[in-house]
Curated annotation (Swiss-Prot):
Pfam families: Aminotran_1_2 (PF00155). SUPFAM superfamilies: PLP-dependent transferases. InterPro entries: Aminotransferase_I/II_large, PyrdxlP-dep_Trfase, PyrdxlP-dep_Trfase_major, PyrdxlP-dep_Trfase_small. This is Uncharacterized protein YER152C. One of its GO terms (cellular component) is nucleus. It comes from Saccharomyces cerevisiae (strain ATCC 204508 / S288c) (Baker's yeast).
Amino acid sequence: MKYKEINFFKGHPSSRLLPREAVIQATAAILGPETREYDNDPYNRHPLTYGSDEGALWVREQICTFLNDQLFKFENGARSRTRADYLNLNSGASYGMLNILLQTTLPHNGYTRQAFIITPTYFLINNCFTDAGFKGKMTAINEQGHDSIDFESLISALEQHEAEPQPHSTTEMIQGPKLTKKVYRYVMYCIPTFANPSGNTYSLETRRRLIDIARKYDMLIITDDVYDILDYTTPSDELPSPPLRMVHIDRSTAPSGEDSFGNTVSNATFSKLIAPGLRFGYHESINANLARQLSKGGANVSGGTPSQLNSMIVGEMLRSGAAQRCIAHLRSVYSERATVLTSALKKYMPLGTEIMPLKGGYFTWITLPPAYNAMEISTILAKKFNVILADGSNFEVIGDEKNWGQSCFRLSISFLEVDDIDRGIELFGAVCKSHAITNNITM
C-alpha cells in the first residue's frame, strides 16, 4: 500500500495560504500608475530601478508605523520606539543573518573570538556561520526550562576565552575608506520568541540579563524575530502584543552617545507573515549607526537594497491593511492546527512524552521517554508510512553536538492540514508502540 506523504519537517506555509490576490493588488497599486511622486526622490526611487542602500524611506516609515503603533503600541516619545533610520531593508532573514556576520564580525584573524548559538538551533544557521568564517568557533548553549538559557555555561565559556592569550589582531582588514565599522569580540544567535525548533519564549529577565552580558563582553546578540507575531494565545482578528524584542530593551537602556552601536540587532522578515517568496525583511538596530553599517556592505553599495520592488509591495500591503489581514488569517489557521497537533500528541504518543506547548510560531518540540530512539523511529516512519519527521539530530550546533537525535523531534504546523496532522501523529504513535514492543520498552 502506498501512503500519502505527510511532512512535518517542512517549515513553510501551505500553498493555499499564500496571498496571491493581495500581492497582485499591491503590485498593481505600485506599478499601475505611470509615475509615482517618489520616483525621483533619492531616498525612495522608482520601484523598478536600483534602490537606495538602506531601502526606500517610505517603506521604512511604514514598517515603523506597524511596529510602533500597531504591534508594540509604544507611547509617543518612548525610547523603545524605532525610526526609519534605525532600519536597513534586506531580502529576508537568511540573507540578513549572513550580512550581519560579514559586516560586524572578524573571526578570520581572531578578533571575533567565538560564536555562541542557542541549542537546539535552526539547523541551516550553521551554514551562515561557516560561510562567515566561524567553522570550529561555534559553542552551543542549552536552553533552560521554557524561558531561559544556561547562563552559567555561557559566562564560563566567555571567561575562558577572555583568559586565553589572544593574537594581536585588528579590524583593519574589514574596514573601508568611508565608514569605520563596529566589529564585535563575540556574537550570539538566538530566537527569543516561539523559537525554532523548541517553541520557547524567553522571559523579560532572560532578555535583560543577556543584554547585560553582551555589554560586558563586547558581544552582538543577533535575534531572529520572525515568529513573535504568530501568537495563538490572543484573538486572531486583532494584532497581538508580542514580548519586547531585545533591540527595544537595548535601545531603551543603552547609554546615550553618538558612538554607540548597541549590542543587539533584530533580524526580521515578512516571509512568515505574508509569503516567503517575496524575500523581504529588515534589520533593526538601537539607533542609526549599526543600521547604516549594515547598509554599506559591498553588495548593497553596488546594487542598492536587494528587494527594491518587493519591499514596496510589502509597504503597500502594510499601508492598505492587507498585510495585517494576511497575519490574522495565518494566525487563525495555525491556531487551529496547533490545537489539533497538541490533542493528537496527547492521544497517540507514549506515556511520559514531553510536549512543549505550542503557543505561537511554527513548531513544537517533543521528547520521548528514555530508551526510545528518535532517529530509528523517524527512519521507520518514513519508509513504512511516508510520514516525514525531523528528529533532533537536525538541530545541532556543528562541532558542539548535544545528542538531540536520541529522543527529540521538531514538528511543524505550517504546511499540513488538520486531517493530515491527526493522521500523521496517529501513525507516529503506532510506530512508537511497535518500537517499544520490539525493544522491550515499558509503555
